[in-house]
């Protein structure tokens, strides 16, 4: 991200030096790249030369909405409690009636911003769990002071029970300490907080996907790329992320916006990319994903580029 920012800045400087005036240079110097800074993070804004002249804003809007609809999926993939923790903290942040200038509230605000940025309670890069600099007593009092309708309660659950369920995940350093554990000699699946395997050991997961592979297949798919592996009645089974499967409510909305984007695609190549991506979301078939990826790589002419879908495997 930082490298891209530098390149954009250099491009803007070159444009200014070639044909701009001193006034233009002065205006460029006044641009504030920093949005906000907290914890170990700095949020930046940057210029996109030519954006105002772009005629494809409708396409960008549709693609952006498709991405936003998948935000909660990412939170859930990063940890099974992330969404409920985020929603509980957001309820406190927006509805708290106490003093919002206290260190406890201010530190909770920083913690929530880190959760927003990292899509969960673990660091986006180091994957270690955040240490909250506010007290359990403060948060419990704040939660219990809210209308129960504002809280992410399970059916029949009370606010006290919500605190009992989520507080160890937030405050106990021994509970889910790493989103991704890579320590030698440990079960990397059981000891990682990410939500791709539920009650499954590393050996069980490796054996499951090994048995699926066809040694004669010269173009194998990325097994497990778009699914969660769980145990049901003692038997391993995949919950595929697709329309009609896991995350269907969010994926249906993603598909809705992608179909909007499909109708205003820049060219036939880009339209083919979007069409195939929609097909992948609808079928969950990893062969469709491979075909989508090939079409995406081949599209070298579209001015608007985007990535949407289950495309990474290091989370």
Where on the chain are the PLM-derived regions?
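C-terminal motif of bacterial Sec signal peptides marking the signal peptidase cleavage site
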Residues: 14-17
């Amino acid at each position: 991200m930082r490298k891209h920012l530098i390149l954009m800045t250099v491009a803007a400087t070159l444009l200014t030096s070639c044909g701009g005036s001193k006034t233009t240079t002065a205006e460029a110097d006044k641009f504030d790249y920093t949005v906000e800074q907290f914890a170990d993070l700095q949020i930046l804004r940057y210029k996109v030369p030519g954006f105002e002249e772009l005629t494809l804003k409708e396409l960008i809007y549709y693609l952006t909405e498709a991405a936003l609809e998948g935000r909660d999926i990412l939170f859930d993939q990063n940890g099974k409690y992330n969404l409920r923790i985020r929603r509980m903290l957001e309820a406190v942040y927006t509805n708290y009636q106490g003093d919002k200038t206290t260190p406890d509230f201010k530190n909770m605000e920083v913690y929530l911003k880190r959760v927003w940025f990292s899509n969960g309670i673990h660091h986006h890069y180091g994957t270690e769990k955040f240490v909250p600099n506010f007290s359990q007593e403060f948060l419990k009092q704040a939660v219990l002071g809210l209308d129960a309708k504002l809280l992410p309660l399970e059916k029949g659950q009370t606010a006290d029970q919500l605190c009992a369920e989520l507080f160890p995940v937030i405050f106990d350093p021994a509970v889910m300490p790493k989103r991704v554990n890579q320590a030698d000699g440990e079960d990397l699946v059981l000891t990682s907080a990410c939500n791709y395997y539920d009650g499954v050991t590393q050996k069980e997961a490796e054996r499951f996907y090994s048995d699926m592979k066809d040694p004669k297949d010269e173009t194998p798919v990325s097994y497990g790329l778009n699914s969660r592996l769980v145990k049901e009645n003692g038997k391993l089974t995949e919950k595929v992320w697709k329309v009609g499967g896991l995350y269907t409510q969010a994926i249906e909305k993603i598909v809705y916006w992608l179909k909007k984007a499909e109708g205003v695609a820049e060219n036939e190549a880009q339209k083919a990319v979007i069409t195939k991506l929609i097909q992948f979301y609808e079928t969950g078939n990893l062969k469709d994903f491979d075909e989508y990826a090939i079409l995406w790589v081949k599209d070298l002419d579209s001015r608007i580029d985007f990535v949407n879908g289950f495309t990474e495997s290091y989370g």
